[in-house]
């Protein structure tokens, strides 16, 4: 996730479960360890030094305060469990993104079935909204969801799929563009092997992270 206040990126790692801060070139600035094995899958900046984290196995969202002096991940200020469509412990929440509304937070379920859930988040809490399931931006050919990002500046939702090797860019009103993550497209010399996270900034720079420890940066050209 992109933090526009610090102008740095934040990501999560598993085994050990940690939050990692990176600069725009992918250099690690600090590692913030957690107090156990939490199976972190996604992180989203909410503003005001607040972050939402998703835990795949537990189907849980938690909020944490992280500032420039944080060295160990503090206890969650709030948590929410969405126990929906539990078919596999390894097919849970894979992406988080702030939505169009001031307090909207979108949560992506990886597969079985593919789905976006919409929650309402206040400064101290998360709660499920009345319109729980959002289907508008999930094309039929998508095999999984491995990351999610909403660009509020342009009103675009980015849905990342490592099994389909694409990013689907949607305006939530029906317009859609597909970005291939295979060799020969967008300056890629090799396929992105396992894309797991996506973010962008206010300058139209797009970042994708992939296992094993790969970092990609895409910048807009005059013709794109």
Question: PLM ranges: what are they?
Answer:
Residues 1-224:
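Sequence/structural signature of beta-propeller domains
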């Amino acid at each position: 996730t992109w933090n526009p206040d610090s102008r740095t990126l934040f990501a999560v790692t598993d085994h050990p479960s940690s939050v990692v801060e990176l600069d725009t070139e992918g250099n690690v600035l600090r590692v913030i360890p957690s107090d156990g094995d939490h199976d972190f899958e996604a992180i989203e900046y909410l503003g005001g030094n607040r972050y939402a984290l998703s835990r795949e196995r537990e189907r849980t969202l938690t909020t944490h305060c992280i500032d420039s002096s944080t060295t160990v991940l503090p206890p969650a200020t709030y948590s929410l469990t969405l126990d929906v469509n539990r078919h596999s412990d390894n097919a849970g929440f894979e992406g988080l993104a702030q939505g169009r509304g001031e307090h909207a937070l979108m949560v992506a379920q990886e597969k079985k079935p593919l789905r976006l859930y919409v929650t309402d988040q206040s400064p101290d809490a998360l709660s499920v909204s009345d319109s729980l399931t959002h289907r508008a931006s999930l094309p039929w050919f998508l095999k999984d969801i491995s990351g999610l990002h909403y660009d509020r500046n342009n009103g675009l939702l980015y849905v990342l799929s490592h099994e389909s090797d694409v990013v689907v860019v949607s305006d939530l009103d029906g317009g859609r563009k597909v970005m291939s993550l295979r060799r020969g497209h967008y300056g890629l010399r090799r396929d992105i092997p396992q894309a797991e996270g996506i973010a962008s900034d206010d300058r139209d720079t797009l970042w994708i992270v992939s296992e094993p420890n790969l970092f990609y940066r895409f910048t807009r050209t005059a013709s794109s």
